[in-house]
Amino acid sequence: MDEVLPLFRDSHIPQIKDYQLELQNDLTKTNEAFQKNLLKNYNKILSLTDSVNDLSLNLKNVDQDFKSLCFNDEKFQLNKLTPLPYQTTTHISPPRDEEKVSIPSQNILVISNWTISINNFCNRIVTSTTPSRIFDELLLNFHELSLIPVPSKFEALVKDKCCRLQKFLVDSMKTLNLTLLQWVKLYNLLNTEFSSKWDDDLLSIFNESLFETLFNDNVQALLISSANSKDHQYHSNQQYKDAIVVDFVNSSTFRDHLIRRTVKEINTHLDTLSTLRAKLKEPETLHKLDIFHDNDTNLNDGTVSPLDDDALKQYIDTAVFYSKGLTNDTTLQIYQTVQPTIEILQNLELYKCPQETLTDLRNKLITQLQEFKTQISSRLPSPLENSTSVVDDFITSYNNHNLLQLVIDQITQLRQQ
């Protein structure tokens, strides 16, 4: 008010209107900035709200327990001990082992917190807005539990909770949104700590599922990042270079699983290659690649333009396939099977696969390619044949020669590995 009165005394109406517009503009900018910051920090606000809610619930529980402790006489009141009868000789039986040593209350608290952390992890990790906090609490309480001796009366409880955690991890492997580092920490927890408490069958299932999940990601990025302490230009994620992850990737267990999985993948490709080569013996089942799209009825009615990006890319790709002699769907599938297999064999050598296994797989692929080469050679037209269509025979011969050269190059590449 003190600022407005002088304005009316000393300024004209247009100046007052300008001041009002300027004030409205400032209010609008301030409101926009507030909304922007509110959206930017919305997740933090939700996280804080969740924490406050948890704290409030805990305080209510503590308050109820404290009231019960103070006023529930039937449960907590200490009655006066009856006087002991006077005896000259007292025979006391020796206490059992569990009665000789009382359990410290601190140890009971550790076991209780550990039990709660497992319940929270299994019940809330999927839906919580702060899953990392629940995960960290689980590992922390496992660490605290490892520092105390577990009393025999609690061993059944500990084993039961460990089994529950294992079942949850196995059943929820595909739905849990954990980071690579968190998965590795769980693997280390289940394979290096509390070994006597874990169920062996569930542990085996967990390990196999975990490795399969990790191998579905970019394994090559893992191996490169673990071997190089500097940031990789394609994979700058810090978790790839964490010491725990690096040690895990460089472990013999990881390498053995990776080699077994890769060998299985190569054998699958070899089986596919055998099936495709058998299909070549039935020419009526082959479908020629259509580079000109003569059957495309929509090409001239404006529905699809030959200049569309997808159509243009398809023309170029098909032309490249033709230049390599890949003129039908089966030879193209053979090429698309062989080429990745060669790359996988190179990776297998990087994984330090036993040389005899590597040589055996390479020889199997070379043998199949040589048989494929023989099939191609048998399709080359003889120069003594009377051609009914010189142009067709020339194109067929040209394509087969290109395909033959492609296979020869692949065999040479394999032998030079």
Swiss-Prot record:
UniProt record, GO biological process: cytoplasm to vacuole targeting by the Cvt pathway; Golgi organization; intra-Golgi vesicle-mediated transport; retrograde transport, vesicle recycling within Golgi
Protein localization: Golgi apparatus membrane
Molecular function in Gene Ontology: protein-macromolecule adaptor activity
Keywords: Acetylation, Golgi apparatus, Membrane, Phosphoprotein, Protein transport, Transport
Modified residues (N-acetylmethionine): M1
Record's GO cellular component terms: Golgi membrane; Golgi transport complex
Top-rank lineage group of the source organism: Eukaryota
Predominant place of localization: Golgi
Topology term for the membrane: Peripheral membrane protein
Transferase is among the record's keywords: no
Modified residue annotations for Phosphoserine: S305
Transmembrane segments: none
General remark: Present with 2190 molecules/cell in log phase SD medium.
Family affiliation: Belongs to the COG1 family.
Function: Acts as essential component of the peripheral membrane COG complex that is involved in intra-Golgi protein trafficking. COG is located at the cis-Golgi, and regulates tethering of retrograde intra-Golgi vesicles and possibly a number of other membrane trafficking events.
Subunit structure: Component of the conserved oligomeric Golgi (COG or Sec34/Sec35) complex which consists of eight different proteins COG1-COG8.
The protein, known as: Conserved oligomeric Golgi complex subunit 1
Organism expressing this protein natively: Saccharomyces cerevisiae (strain ATCC 204508 / S288c)
Gene: COG1
